[in-house]
Structures are given as structure tokens and as C-alpha cells.
Amino acid sequence: MFSNYFKIAWRNLWKHKMFSVIVIFGMAIAFAAALLLSLTAYHELSYDQFHEHKKNIYQLYFHEQHARGDETSSTMPIPLAPALKAEYPDVQYITRFGGSAYSMVRYKNKELDLDVRTVDPDFLRMFTFPISTGNSQTPLGNLNDIVITEHCAKVLFDQEDPIGKTIEMKRGTSWTSFSVTAVAKDFPNNSSFTFDILSRFEHFHDYQELQNTWDSDNHEVFVQLRDGVKQAAFEKQTPAFIHKFYTEKLTSMKRDGAQPNKSGEIMQLLALPFTDIHFSEISGTGARASKFYSYMLLVISGFILFIACVNFVNLSLARSFTRSKEIGIRKVMGAMRWQLISQFWGEALIVSCFALIVGLGIAYLLLPYYKQVFYQVMSVNMLRSPLIIMYVLAGFLLVTLFAGGYPAWMVSKFNTIETVKGKLPVGRSNKVRNSLMVVQFVLSSLLIICTMIVWQQINYLRNKPLGYNKQQVVSLPIGGTMDSEQALSLLRNRLAHEPRILSVTGTDMNIGRGRDGSSTTSMMGFDYKNKGISTHWLRIDYDYLKTMDIQLLSGRDFSRSYGMDTAGVLINETMARQLGEKDPLGSMLALDGTQLKVLGVVKDFHFKSLHRELAPLTMVVRPNWPVSYIFIRVQPDNLPASMEVIKKAWKEVNPKATFLASFLDENTDRTYKKETRLSQIFMSGAVLAILISCMGLFAIALLAIIQRTKEIGIRKVLGASVPQIVGLVSKDFLLLVLVAIVIATPIAWYVMHNWLQSFYYRIHIAWWVFALAGLIALVIAFITLSLQSVKAALKNPVTSLRSE
């Protein structure tokens, strides 16, 4: 019996090839798009989930109630971690996590620039980075013990056993020996922690000088609480710790007008759940992704799948009119309601199976291109994940039940006598069809509006004046074994006579996100005239203002003609306002026991992303603070040739360093990569949603025209023109699209208004965006309808009325 249902279902699908293709192709596209978008969201939401003790691990951060506003920071002073563990038995393990004074690694004749991180021994007890070979109990037991990843072992040692081998790492001009005690398995690509080598935190730069200093924050701290200890309980204990170790800072903050929060505190030590750091703006370890984006991907995938389901439902209901006699005869012959439902549901099952198979094939073929376009690191293996398989099966069953079950249930309710006559109650069916079409175009209009607003915001970020000229400036990370000051001096001299090179300077901070992935800044705090001052700190070299085209408002720039400029600073406008001086030139700033003189004030420029407000900035030229980047301004014509000149010179100056130069405008664009990716996904989702909606609209319009063939013929005989016929067929559908636009407008405004709040600098949503989006939706719908209505209007009325 069931085989007979499937045979009939197959024949019906084969008989109505165009409708079958529209439904199967639309569903296949929807399945493929939903799967790819869901894989992206799954990857983002799976970050750091592989750690066994993830629920008990937290990152510490400060929240401070300054008079100038709230400040949050995840960087900690060196003595905090050991003091906290000694004070609180609820802390089972604690580790500091920082960069290293070393990066250049040497073994025999190999010298490589590797990612070296400094941690405490508890790190490998807290986090799940399994040891594949070597000492798994105390891998960092001795000061000069190190743990390397499998990838690092292969790069350094090839086929040799790395355990017990001695390697050297360079600090300044000297090399220090380390012993490999263990090899850790390579971390997955959904790990917030990345490293090639783990060494003891005692090798952190400036450790010896700052190990007892509480006012210099330069690394991150993670704690693992004992089982049963909640985050809130831990945070209730930390005020006593703050009052014990930060007495001077609390006094200074109160003196400057800091007001306590609801908890009565002006400075708090809080805990961020480790599984949230990938999505947190607080953490420096996380990628600063957004759960909003991940959830939006799931929402968009649901939208696309729902729109395809609506097409299926509407087409099934519409086709029931052409199959009314078949339904009636089956009822007369004794077919039960459940049998009719089984037959129609069987057709839906066949369509869904075909669509799923085709959709999986499309997703598999498009995955490499999808990864490239949207900067994803997904693999085909993710398709074999039990969670993904369950998601696909659940989606398949829901689609089949909804898209096939509802039309089958509706058709089975039709009156037997009326169906035999070929007459069906169209009122309720049309209401359902119209309601579903409205929902369909609400979702499509939402995606169109959101796409336009996201693109506007990104273009605003890209084109907003930054206070410096990012065009034609090359950013070159120094790296390598050479002293950074020496590398800068040699490259400057080497490029001095190149006509394509306009100026060369150095800095310890990149702008934007370079090819080396760095985008860090430094913070300093000090007292000035009994007032606490906090400022970002930037080490620059001579000609920085010239190279970056930054405006000097007052005073003078650093100059080699003045030998004492190494004891001077340049400040930005925001820093000048924080000092509270009408004329800050000549003011003396006391920092780490050194008096620094304000030489000049520069116009504010955005050295950080536009997500954040302009902050105070102090710039210094101090040879004992190494530079990490070289900035080179080049002639505006033939930029590739200029880059080749720089590359050739760099290879001569620093042959062992990797050439990772990039243009500053590229760096700033990378800063907004996630927004760019979101806009691309929105656009792709909008295009797919409109495409699938229009496929359904096309088919529904065709069925509506078939039902009204004789009416159209009679109207033509009575003198109706082609535009009148087109208007007759199109107006009801266009009205539904207009209703959808009206519904979508406030929803889109609310969603995008909240999204824009994550940017300090943002656009204002203009009314014309909604008008233009509505016009686009109406025009696309009208063109889709016209493809069929014009054809019907031009048809010979004799053909339409022949059966009469």
C-alpha cells in the first residue's frame, strides 16, 4: 500500500516537472545555505568547549569606577596571581599568561621566529592540552623547562625525538638554553589560546623588575575554582583583596572623585567565564567575536529554510486545485483521511529527500569557496560531527512534517462532492497562502534592510577621517634576531636614496591588524598634581608625525637636533584635556621615577578601532624601549613596485626575519573583518531569501493565472489592455509585499539600532533606507509577476475560452 503511494507521488512529481524543480531546487538551496551558515555558527560557539574543566575556569579582570567614567581591563600586575592563590583556598589553580621576552628560537643550524608564551605550571593542569610524549606530570617543573606543540616539534626537530633536547631562545643580544620536557598535542582551531612553545612565567619580559610592582599591568590571569564554588561567591570575596593590596590606588581614585557602584565599590576584581572570552571585549586572549553574529547566522539559516518551506506549502495548496477531481474520486472510492494524508506526505518526503541530497552536495562543493569568501576555518570533517548530523536530521524532519504535513491535512478536509465537481473552498486556503507569503517577504525585507545598514556602517568606518593618512604607508613587523633599533637604522639608511620612499619611522604598536596578527596597546598610570592620570603609551621614532601625516597643534615634534628629546613626550588633545592645563607645553610628567617634559600636542587620531572612544595617548622616543614595527611612507604611484623595493632592502638588512609587510589601509580594514563578514553573509542571505521567495511567487502566480485563465480571456474579449491584465494579476500580490515591508521596517530598525550601539562612532539610520529597501522588494516582486502575467495577457483569448 505504501509503495503504491510512493509510486503515485513519484508520477505526480514527474508530471508537474516545473513545480517539482522549483520546490526541489528551492529547498536544496535552502538546505545548503542553512547548513553552511549553521556550520559557521557551530564553529564560533564551540570555541574553548574542548577543555575538561571549562565550567570552573575564569579570567580575572578589573572594573573601575573613575570620575571620568567606567574602565574595564583584563591585564594584571605580576604579583597578583601568587597573592590571590595564597589568600583564597577556593582557588584550586591559577596561571598567568603572557608573551615572552623570547621569540627567536635556535636549534643546531635552524633559527625560527616562533610563538612563545609564558605561563605558570598550573596552566597545563587547568587547560586540556594533552601531553603526547614526555613528562605529563610536571612538564614545567624547572625554570628552564619548556613544552612544545607537535607542529613545533616537527618544524624544529624533523624526525628526531625532541624530549631532552636543548634549544636556545634569544633575548636582546644573548641566547638562553631551554630543555624540552614534553610535547603537547596541537590545539584545535577553535582554541582561544595559541602557542608554539610554553615556558615558565619567570621568563616574561620585565619579570625581574616588576615582580613586586602592583601598578604595572601587562599580562592576563586565569583561575580554576574548586568544585562547587560559584562565580558570584568568588567575586564577593575579592573586595577584601582589593582593599588589602590596592590601598594607594583606592585613595587616589577617591581623591579624584570616583563614585562607588551599587555594591559600594570603586574598584572590583571580577571573573569572566572562560567559555565567554572568545566573545568578550574585555579579554585580550579572545578573538573579540560576537555571539550576536553567531546567533544571527542561525536566525538567517532559519529564515532561508522557513521561506523554502513556505514555498512548498503554498505550491502544495495551490496544486490541490488542479488535483481536486483526483482527491474527490479517491474519497468516493473509499480513501480514508489518513490515506490521503499519507499520499501527500509521501510526495513531500520524496521532495525533501531529493532536496536534502542535492543540498548536501551543493554544500560540499561550495564549502571551499565559502571558507575563502567568509574567512572561515571549517573543514569537511565538521559534517561528520554527531551534533551536525542530528541538526541536519532534525531540520529534515521538521521541514518534511511542516511543509508536507500541513498541505496534506488541509487537502484531506475538502468536501467529497465539491472536490468531485472540481470545486474547492479557496477562501481559507488563500488566506493561509497570503499569510505565509507576507511572512516570507517580511523575512526577505528584513535581510535587505539589514544588509543596507551594515554596508553603510562599514563604509562609514572605512571612510571616516582617522586623524592620520593611512594611504601609501607600509607597516613592517621587525622580528628576527637583529636588535630592533639597529634594524630600523639600517633600513632607514638603505632606503634613504630610494626615490619611491618618502619617510621611515618606527613604533612599538601597529595600527589596525597587520599580517602578524598583532593589534596591542600599552597603558600607563601616574599622578599629576594630585590627580590620577591614565594614558595609552606609544613608543615612536623620529619622523613618526611626518610618516603618518599627523597634525601638530602646538609645540614641536621630536628632533635629532635636541639631545634631551628622549626625556620628552608628545601628547594628544584628549590627554591634554585630562591634564587640565590650558597650555600643557613644558609640563613635567613623573613616570617610573623619570621626569618627562611635554614638547608638543598633536591632533587626536584613532590609534584604536572605531568601536571605542578616542583615548588619552602619550608618545615617547626612548631607545631603551624597543620598536616592533617600521612604518614607511611611499610614493602614491605603483605601490607594488614600492613594496618590492622595501622587500629587497629588508632581505639585505635582516635576512633571517620573515617579511610580513602590509599597507596600513589593509590593516584598518582587517580590524573590521567581522563586520565585513557579517555584511557579506547578510547580503548572501538576502539574495538567497529573495531568490527563493521569487521562485515561490513565480509558481504561485502561474497557478493563479491558470485558475483565472477564462476570466483573463473574457476580459480581453471585452477590451482589457495588457497593462490592465498585468495589474489585475499583480496587484494583490504586490499589496502583500507592501504589507510585509511595513511589518519588517520597525523590526529591522530595532535590530540594527541595537547592533549599532556596539560602535562608539556610528551612522544614524535614515528613513530612505527603508523606502529604498521596500522599493527594491516591490520591483523584484513585480518583475517576477510580470514574467507570467504579461505572457497571460498576450495569450489569444480564443485559446483560453476554447473549452466553452
Question: For each predicted feature, which ranges?
Answer:
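Membrane-helix entry/capping segments
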Residues: 1-6, 11, 15, 19, ...
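Alpha-helical transmembrane segments of integral membrane proteins
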Residues: 1-21, 283-286, 316-353, 364-485, ...
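Small-residue-rich transmembrane alpha-helices
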Residues: 32, 36-39, 270, 349-414, ...
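Membrane-proximal juxtamembrane linkers immediately C-terminal to transmembrane helices
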Residues: 35-63, 89, 130, 192, ...
